[in-house]
Curated annotation (Swiss-Prot):
Sorted UniProt keywords: ATP synthesis, Cell inner membrane, Cell membrane, CF(1), Hydrogen ion transport, Ion transport, Membrane, Transport
Similarity annotation: Belongs to the ATPase gamma chain family.
Organism encoding this protein: Acidiphilium cryptum (strain JF-5)
Membrane topology designation: Peripheral membrane protein
Main subcellular location: membrane
Pfam families from the UniProt entry: ATP-synt
MF (Gene Ontology): ATP binding; proton-transporting ATP synthase activity, rotational mechanism
Record's subcellular location: Cell inner membrane
Coiled coil, from the record: none
Region of interest called Disordered, as start-end residue ranges on this chain: 194-216
Upper taxonomic lineage: Bacteria, Pseudomonadati, Pseudomonadota, Alphaproteobacteria, Acetobacterales
PANTHER family reported in the protein's UniProt record: ATP SYNTHASE GAMMA CHAIN, ATP SYNTHASE SUBUNIT GAMMA, MITOCHONDRIAL
The protein's name in its UniProt record: ATP synthase gamma chain
Length: 296
């Protein structure tokens, strides 16, 4: 049986931890409100942008002069997976779920005879893939020390991806991230980046009350696409970063809430054990005193 001093120290330690987890829950809740608002504001723009690029890709499928960023380079040998994770832990299964999903996709592609390359966004994804897929990583990014994610951050990542594509390091690029559904739910999701998915327009417009429509391009296709294609990559990456940020805070708030409640239950059990031990010690001392008095 543990001593009273050990139990008191244990109770004090758990109470201290409970204060920390409660504070982290409150901080995550405050950050979640802003992150959720940003993610929800960016989502329609990214969705319509993807739909437009999908429509353009479908229309340009037979055009031999169509930009490679739009329709691909005609090859399907090397796949780049851009994995978006968090820079910090203590968020339940948030990071593990997207990392495992990306690893499963990589292994599936390899089983099909494809080559896989990785671009990790976030320290948790970087550390995860450095352990067993270090040689496949061609780029890394994180936001350590930054309070907010800016569009310029997404543009920088997009520029690195475009440069790698132009250098022939991959043929197909897919973005993987945790899509924010609710505080309790963050779902690993995929978005095609290169080439633009021709089926994306129909899929996105199926859930939209706005018609797809025909696009009139001015002054000409080349001028517009030269600017629009890199921006589309940046928009999709930026939206994924915001979705992931909101999901991270939701997962952390849930994890810290569970930790706080578990700490409370542990404190109750330890306190009960402490009281029982103290009562047993007092009873033992009384018996010894009474036995000593009877002996006299």
């Amino acid at each position: 049986m543990a001593s009273l001093k050990a139990l008191r120290n244990r109770i004090a330690s758990v109470k201290s931890t409970q204060k920390i987890t409660k504070a982290m829950k409150m901080v995550a809740a405050a950050k979640l409100r802003r992150a959720q608002a940003q993610a929800e504001a960016a989502r329609p723009y990214a969705t319509r942008m993807a739909a437009m690029m999908g429509a353009l890709a479908e229309g340009a499928a037979e055009n031999p002069n169509a930009p490679a960023l739009l329709v691909g380079n005609g090859a399907d040998r090397t796949h780049l997976i851009v994995v978006v994770s968090a820079d910090r832990g203590l968020a339940g299964p948030f990071n593990a779920s997207i990392n495992r999903a990306a690893r499963a996709r990589a292994r599936k592609l390899e089983a099909e005879g494809k080559q896989v390359r990785l671009f990790t966004v976030g320290r948790k994804g970087r550390d995860f893939f450095r352990r067993d897929m270090r040689e496949k990583i061609i780029g890394e990014a994180n936001f350590v020390g930054k309070k907010t994610i800016e569009f310029a951050d997404a543009e920088a990542i997009a520029n690195q991806i475009i440069a790698a594509f132009n250098d022939g390091k991959f043929d197909v690029c897919t973005l993987m991230f945790n899509r924010f559904v609710s505080v309790m739910s963050q779902v690993p999701s995929e978005t095609p980046l290169i080439p633009a998915s021709a089926g994306q327009a129909a899929n996105d417009n199926a859930g939209s009350d706005q018609p797809a429509g025909d696009y009139e391009i001015e002054p000409d296709d080349g001028t517009l696409l030269d600017r629009l294609l890199p921006r589309n990559l940046a928009v999709q990456i930026y939206s994924a970063l915001l979705e992931s940020a909101a999901g991270e805070q939701g997962a952390r708030m849930t994890a810290m809430d569970n930790a706080t409640r578990n700490a409370g239950e542990m404190i109750n059990r330890l306190t009960l054990n402490y009281n029982r031990t103290r009562q047993a010690n007092i009873t033992k001392e009384l018996i010894e005193i009474i036995s000593g008095a009877e002996a006299l």
